[in-house]
């Protein structure tokens, strides 16, 4: 299945305790249908000490959130939107905004080099 939301996309949370929060996708977990978004779904983790390496304590970290709870923000119209797919004249499959019909390029963080 094609990824509608990829690493580097700007998204808004539409459900849950962080509803309305915006952030960039730091990591995409496609097998679990989850994403990690900067500044969203902050949890506290109790860490054990490892002698000589790290100190014990409580750290705050971003936990994964289900991909159905976030919506892509279109870089062209600036609104939360659903994502569609279509083929260009060259036969390349691209994402597009369902509101303004503009092609949404994949962020530089996600682009693969061959």
Curated annotation (Swiss-Prot):
GO terms for cellular component: ribonucleoprotein complex; ribosome. One of its GO terms (biological process) is translation. Gene3D superfamilies: 2.30.30.30. Transmembrane segments: none annotated. Keywords: Ribonucleoprotein, Ribosomal protein, RNA-binding, rRNA-binding. It holds the Pfam family KOW. Part of the 50S ribosomal subunit. This is Large ribosomal subunit protein uL24.
